[in-house]
Regions:
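Primary recognition of N-terminal secretory signal peptides and signal-anchoring hydrophobic helices
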Residues: 1-194
Length: 194
């Protein structure tokens, strides 16, 4: 009786091991790079098709991604946001000297805004990942409706003074937020301090 149980257990383990090997050959991990940056999640290769978690790409794509389960529909909304920085003399710039204090504002042109948003903001992140908010608008602001009731609008931030004390890449980012959702990165520009 004991021998019979041992044979059955050995066969079960052998079959399980074979199934794992077969499954490993059917589904292989795929490393995903977007603009030479590795995604936080790997994809899977199944029958020569790559499957990825699209939500993990929302910041890379700089888009709103929404899964509507009841409709079996994936919706990707990508507003166009073009930003540039202007000094107090209204001259555009994208490079600064390390250690310089700059007074500037951010100009943003937004179009193809086909989703309702409750807030937007502009941030600047230094090479050490310390982020400051340059300007923001939300539904509580009197002028918010003039920006977001159209699918196209222009935005000028307030004039700010900022110390570019570190050498490296500073990230100028434009975020939008939908109702009951986290802020979503929509656009990013790089300012280099040398």
């Amino acid at each position: 009786m004991m021998r019979k149980k041992l044979v059955i257990l050995s066969m079960a383990l052998l079959l399980a091991g074979g199934s794992i090997v077969a499954a490993d050959k059917l589904m292989q991990k795929v490393t995903l790079l977007y603009n030479n940056k590795q995604s936080s999640e790997d994809g899977l290769l199944v029958d020569d098709k790559v499957y990825i978690n699209i939500r993990s790409l929302s910041d890379s794509l700089q888009a709103f991604i929404q899964w509507k389960g009841s409709e079996k529909k994936l919706v990707i909304q990508k507003p166009n946001v073009h930003m540039f920085m202007m000094n107090e003399k209204r001259t555009m710039f994208g490079q600064v000297e390390k250690g310089s204090v700059q007074k500037f504002l951010v100009q943003a042109q937004i179009d193809n805004l086909n989703v309702a948003i409750t807030e937007f903001k502009v941030t600047l992140t230094d090479p050490n990942d310390k982020e400051i908010t340059i300007d923001r608008r939300s539904q509580a602001d009197d002028d918010f409706k003039e920006f977001v009731e159209k699918d196209t609008f222009w935005f000028s931030s307030k004039l700010v003074s900022y110390d570019f004390k570190y050498a490296g890449r500073y990230k100028l980012r434009f975020w939008m937020e939908q109702k009951n959702a986290e802020p979503q990165l929509i656009s990013e520009k790089i300012i280099t301090a040398k």
